[in-house]
A protein has these predicted regions:
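A Rossmann-like FAD-binding core segment of flavoenzymes
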Residues: 2, 68-165
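Redox-cofactor binding/interface segments in oxidoreductases and associated redox assembly factors
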Residues: 9-10, 52, 126, 139, ...
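Short hydrophobic core segments
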Residues: 2-14, 53, 132-142, 185, ...
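Glycine-rich dinucleotide-binding loop and its adjacent helix/turn
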Residues: 11-69, 163
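A short, polar/charged loop-to-alpha-helix boundary motif
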Residues: 261-280
């Protein structure tokens, strides 16, 4: 037993394995740790057809790495599009086209019935009856916070540990910091040491590298139907480059860069500084 005056709870998260029949077969894997990567590298040696369940950033990155190994790869996504809610429709279309040009099959709006096989994976059966051939399945279906210890200790938790603006839990002196969230950790550590800092939520952003392209999306990219956004777009379909900026009340609120992300730092700063449409047009 280790007595403490202050404690920081930072046990991270684990890959979510959906309750699909066959998810325990030897050729079904997740990719989160170095050990996971080493296991997949070994499985790839005897595989020809791979299925990635999940069409988010990590799923597409996994699909690309498997394709580079020479496997036939299919991505299965339950949502109507890849990266649902994370990027806008023009970007989805272009990114899907890039993936298909690289030989990756994309199936969206599908539900998984089971992973087929007895001792080895033989395919993934869809709810509609179709079976996608596979001898390797990668699950990329999100993560879940590790909250069992927190709950046992009496910390309030929902899908994650619940904290206030100081990153303190419902138990005085115990703080929690989110998985891979450096700023959260800094605030929690400072407050545990006696400071009184408040956490300021960061602007949501995602980045993707693979399939010979790169993607960066940040902020509000037109996801709220009630807001009359203005958009500015620069598109080069031949070179598969897209820049799209979203404005609300004349202020930059979000942006997407595809194919050329060299200006991501500039765009991030512009959103933080609440640059106007006029100011941004002057830089185009």
């Amino acid at each position: 037993v280790y007595p403490f005056d202050k404690c920081i709870y930072a046990l991270g998260a684990h890959s979510f394995v959906p309750p699909i029949k066959g998810n325990d077969l030897p050729q079904v894997a997740v990719v989160r740790s170095i050990a996971d990567v080493e296991r997949v590298n070994a499985l790839v040696q005897d595989a020809k057809n791979a299925v990635v369940i999940g069409g988010g950033v990590l799923g597409l990155e996994a699909a690309w790495e498997l394709r580079r190994f020479g496997l036939d790869v299919t991505v299965l996504e339950s949502a109507p599009v890849l990266m649902a809610g994370k990027i806008d429709t023009p970007t989805v279309r272009m990114l899907t086209g890039i993936a298909e040009c690289k030989g990756i099959s994309i199936l969206t709006g599908v539900q998984i019935a089971e992973i087929s096989g007895t001792e080895r994976v033989t395919g993934v059966k869809l709810a509609g009856g179709e079976t996608v051939a596979a001898d390797l399945v990668i699950l990329s279906t999100g993560v879940r916070a590790n909250i069992a210890v927190a709950q046992a200790a009496g910390l309030a938790a929902d899908r994650a540990v619940i904290v206030n603006e100081n990153m303190e839990t419902n138990v005085a002196g115990i703080y929690a910091a989110g998985d891979c969230a450096q700023e959260m950790g800094r605030i929690a550590g400072a407050n545990a040491a006696g400071e009184a800092l408040s956490y300021q939520p960061e602007i949501n952003a995602l980045s993707f590298h693979g399939m010979g392209t790169s993607l960066y999306a940040i902020g509000d990219i037109g996801t709220r139907a009630e807001i009359p956004y203005k958009t500015v777009e620069i598109k080069d379909e031949q070179n598969q480059v897209l820049r799209r900026a979203y404005f609300h009340h004349g202020i930059l609120c979000g942006a997407i860069l595809l194919g050329d992300t060299s200006r991501m730092a500039e765009v991030t700063a512009a959103i933080q500084e609440k640059k106007t449409l006029k100011e941004m047009l002057e830089k185009v």
